[in-house]
């Protein structure tokens, strides 16, 4: 190759690099636009379907308790491990069908009212009962003045008072049903306003635009400390507001709630989606984070709607 051709090739390469630089990097596409949305208003039970029969029974017992209008104690027919406990809690927190906005915290308690360390994940079946605290905004002031009292062996010494706190929420079946309908109405309204004949790719873009224009990332919740959770009942209820599908009412949420909103909208138009959770690095520290896994045009994509909400960019 002669000198002129080498110089010409160099110039063309440089021009190409400059074009890429000036135009910015190419945005990854979500789907190809081949499948139409179905507006089926169906959901999926991705997390629930992976539970074994014992875990499903406990999950259903918790749901039934809350739907009756209160929290309280559930005595387990057979002890479960923290591994099983975590699977149940994750289902009630993130499953598109079984996610329950009304649950704030579920306390694992063992023999002699010992609070089991939920962060030690193992197969030891030492959880004998669960205490369910519902998300009751009307009675949160009481939680500011209540503390679980633990002795040196992690035994809850004020268990009767704690059970009363769980059972005495200003909650009712009617309130649960009314707020559930109010939450559903928000999602229905968004879908009702969608242009007709959208394909899956366009629908996802539409939902992300809605999140960008309407949702606000709640930094105040993210920056507040919620650990140790048994000592921060009030803070955990506020945290729950921003991390379940009900956060659509106040248009404020954090990664969990925003991811649930996107997956909920997608499922209602026939796009299979569910929240997934892991960790990301922030200033060198690993922190929890949520995304959405979805099937668009027969391929799986992982979308971070929180990034859209925080930056206003896709």
In which residue ranges do the predicted regions lie?
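Intrinsically disordered, low-complexity N-terminal segments that are enriched in acidic
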Residues: 24-163
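Acidic/histidine-rich, surface-exposed loop or edge segments in extracytoplasmic proteins
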Residues: 39-44, 66-71, 163-173, 181-193
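A short, highly charged nucleic-acid-interacting micro-segment common to nuclease
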Residues: 244-258
């Amino acid at each position: 190759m002669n000198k002129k051709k080498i110089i010409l090739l160099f110039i063309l390469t440089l021009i190409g690099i400059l074009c890429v630089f000036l135009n910015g990097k190419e945005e990854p596409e979500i789907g190809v636009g081949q499948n139409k949305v179905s507006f089926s208003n169906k959901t999926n039970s991705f997390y629930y379907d992976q539970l074994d029969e014992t875990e499903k029974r406990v999950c259903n017992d918790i749901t039934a308790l809350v739907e009756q209008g209160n929290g309280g104690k559930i005595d387990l027919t057979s002890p479960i491990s923290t591994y099983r406990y975590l699977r149940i809690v994750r289902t009630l927190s993130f499953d598109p069908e079984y996610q329950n906005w009304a649950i704030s915290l579920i306390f694992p308690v063992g023999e002699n009212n010992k609070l089991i360390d939920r962060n030690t994940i193992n197969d030891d079946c030492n959880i004998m009962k669960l205490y369910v605290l519902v998300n009751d905004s009307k009675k949160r002031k009481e939680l500011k003045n209540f503390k679980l009292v633990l002795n040196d062996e992690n035994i809850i010494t004020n268990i009767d008072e704690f059970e009363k706190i769980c059972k005495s929420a200003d909650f009712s079946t009617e309130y649960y049903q009314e707020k559930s309908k109010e939450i559903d109405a928000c999602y229905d309204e968004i879908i009702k306003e969608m242009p007709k004949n959208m394909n899956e790719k366009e629908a996802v873009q539409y939902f992300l635009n809605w999140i960008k224009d309407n949702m606000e990332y709640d930094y105040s919740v993210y920056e507040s400390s919620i650990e140790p959770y048994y000592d921060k009942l009030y803070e955990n209820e506020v945290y729950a507001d921003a991390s379940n599908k009900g956060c659509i009412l106040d248009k404020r949420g954090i990664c969990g709630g925003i991811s649930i909103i996107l997956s909920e909208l997608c499922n209602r138009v026939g796009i299979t989606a569910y929240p997934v959770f892991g960790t990301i690095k922030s200033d060198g520290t690993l922190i929890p984070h949520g995304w959405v896994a979805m099937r668009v045009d027969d391929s799986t994509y992982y979308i971070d709607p929180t990034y859209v909400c925080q930056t206003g960019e896709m």
